[in-house]
Amino acid sequence: MMADEELGDEVKVFRRDEDADDDPMISGETSEQQLADDKKEAVMEAELDGAGRNPSIDVLKSAFPKVEPMSPSFPGLMSHFSPGYSAAALPMFMPLFMNPYAAALRSPSLMFPMGAMSPTFPMFPPSPVYGAAIAAAAAKQHFENMAPLNMRAGHPMNQMGMPPYMHPSSMAPQNVDRRAQGGGKAKKDDHVKKPLNAFMWFMKENRKALLEEIGNNEKQSAELNKELGKRWHDLSKEEQAKYFEMAKKDKETHKERYPEWSARENYAVNKKKTKKRRDKSIPSENNDQKKCRARFGVNNTEMWCKFCKRKKKCEYATDRSGGSDITDSQDGRGTSGAYSSSSESPSPKANAGIALTTQQQQAAMMHTMLMQMRLGSTTGASTHVPSPLASSSAGRSPLDANASDSESDVEEEEDEQIDPTVMQQTHDMLMQESMCTI
């Protein structure tokens, strides 16, 4: 009685009155054959829909299994979703229905390559209509499509012309071959080693024997070379002659093989500094261009200028573009005792005072000669015009006093030579002033 009452209550909740007569659950009729037919029809409809849809959407759908109806009472459970965006194609909505194979291919951002799965490879158990041959072909295509789209040769996303995708296992033998060949770095073919000398031949023959001796295995290369050098010096000339002969033959063979070779070609540093060395190798025309080190030597540092002592630019070295310096005859550093001509450039530092003194002396000499010529011209004339320059010593001007002082200086330094250019300038000025006075 209790079971009948519970059955009656369930019928009142879920059953409608107008469908009471047609309900197979109430009538008690069996529908196993009808359920099997419904399953076959659903599979056929899904295959027909997949053939007419966009393959890109089918790729997404094929990565997830299709949920079968639980019972005939729930035939339209998944029909509420649109055909293009079914629940099986949306991992964020239905993550529990995802196939474990598709989950392995999914990236952390729930996105995976469009061609990771084949549209023709179903993830749910195939229907009895298809045979084992179709399943095998689909599995083969599935493994071929495991490569990303951007690595496929004919895919439009491969716009950079990348090589076809290759499995890492196929590239392993190439890596092994590259390591066996020496690491992949190409050696320079144009580098030619110079021939070995006698000592190098001696080292080449005896180095291995030296390493085999007890206690030499842990020594460094420098220590081994030192020991080989001692043994080389201990050899007699007859024993060394053997290695000299080997070095001679090696040099001749090397010369025949590389007739135009020179050892300088192996040193690129010298190639870069060739131009600079040529510029510095310009010979000096006179001794004035030399520094104190070249003039007086390394032992005579007391004669060096103060700049050379501090390793600075020499005081007496001139620029290559200019003339020579004024030589200093007072301290013994000059090359000649006479002063340089007016066309030569004076030294800007230490010789500035000397040049100023020389100019003052020349001006005084010019003034003295001018006064003498004026006095001679005025005494011979008929009319004497008094001039302040010819006044007495008591009332003479400062210029006359300077002239008289300079006369004594000139008498004391009669041995000095006067530049002919200065003499010519003095003569011209004298003639002009004489004409003005007359």
From Swiss-Prot:
It is found in: Nucleus; Cytoplasm. Residues 1-39, 250-288, 318-351, 378-438 are annotated as: Disordered. Its main location: nucleus. Phosphorylated on Ser-118 and Ser-127 by lit-1 in the beta-catenin-lit-1 complex. Phosphorylation promotes the interaction of pop-1 and par-5 and the subsequent translocation of pop-1 from the nucleus to the cytoplasm. GO terms for molecular function: beta-catenin binding; DNA-binding transcription activator activity, RNA polymerase II-specific; DNA-binding transcription factor activity; DNA-binding transcription factor activity, RNA polymerase II-specific; histone acetyltransferase binding; histone deacetylase binding; protein kinase binding; RNA polymerase II cis-regulatory region sequence-specific DNA binding. Disruption phenotype: Knockout specifically targeted at seam cells causes an increase in seam cell number, but this is caused by a combination of anterior daughter cells adopting the seam fate, and abnormal differentiation of posterior seam cells. RNAi-mediated knockdown also increases the number of seam cells as a result of anterior daughter cells failing to differentiate and adopting the seam fate. RNAi-mediated knockdown in L1 larvae causes a severe loss of M lineage-derived coelomocytes and sex myoblasts. Residues 192-262 bind DNA. Transmembrane segments: none annotated. Residues 1-45 are annotated as: Sufficient for interaction with beta-catenin/sys-1. Residues 88-130 are annotated as: Involved in nuclear asymmetry. It comes from the Eukaryota. Residues 406-418 have a biased composition (Acidic residues). InterPro entries: HMG_box_dom, HMG_box_dom_sf, TCF/LEF. One of its GO terms (cellular component) is beta-catenin-TCF complex. Residues 270-279 have a biased composition (Basic residues). One of its GO terms (biological process) is gonad morphogenesis. Residues 9-18, 250-263 have a biased composition (Basic and acidic residues). Keywords: Activator, Cytoplasm, Developmental protein, DNA-binding, Nucleus, Phosphoprotein, Transcription, Transcription regulation, Wnt signaling pathway. The modification Phosphoserine is found at residues 118, 127. SUPFAM superfamilies: HMG-box. Belongs to the TCF/LEF family. Transcription factor. Part of the Wnt signaling asymmetry pathway. Binds to the consensus sequence, 5'-(C/T)TTTG(A/T)(A/T)(G/C)-3'. Activates or represses target gene expression, depending on upstream Wnt signals and interactions with transcription co-regulators, such as beta-catenin/sys-1 or zinc finger transcription factor ref-2. Essential for the specification of the mesodermal and endodermal cell fates in early embryos. Required in many asymmetrical cell divisions in the early embryo and during larval development. Interacts (via N-terminal region) with beta-catenin homolog sys-1. Interacts with hda-1. Interacts with bar-1. Interacts with par-5; the interaction is direct and is enhanced by lit-1-mediated pop-1 phosphorylation. The interaction also leads to the subsequent nuclear export of pop-1. Interacts (when phosphorylated on Ser-118 and Ser-127) with lit-1; the interaction is dependent on the beta-catenin-lit-1 complex. Interacts with wrm-1. Interacts with homeobox protein egl-5. PANTHER family: PROTEIN PANGOLIN, ISOFORM J, TRANSCRIPTION FACTOR 7 FAMILY MEMBER. This is Protein pop-1. It comes from Caenorhabditis elegans. The gene is pop-1.
